[in-house]
């Protein structure tokens, strides 16, 4: 029993460490994306092409947190379901919105099944983006890879730390 409990505790600690958000409050928006990519590459050994063009240096903390979590979950999904094949992230700004695109060349899936059991990551990403007044879409089809696209407004209120 003691060994089983130690093993379970080790497993729970590993999960909890993945839930903790790194300190991104002082990072620029680009550095936040770079941090998400670097963390992913270190954990998986997979490389990600990151293209950052014309984004503001800074953004409200809720936008940085949502961006980080969106990138983290998108890359993790790609790794789990598509072996991290040809992953690419594009970040740009247009009309006061941060546009995030995460693509892979994996096997793809039918987006109509996004809200069924086992697709909680996609639903969680959508909720995070929509809470900030943004939009979220998934483009995919069997055998053709997947693109996750989010538009986040860059003018959201800052959250006071307690």
For each feature predicted by the language model, list its residue ranges.
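Coiled-coil dimerization/phosphotransfer module
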Residues: 1-162
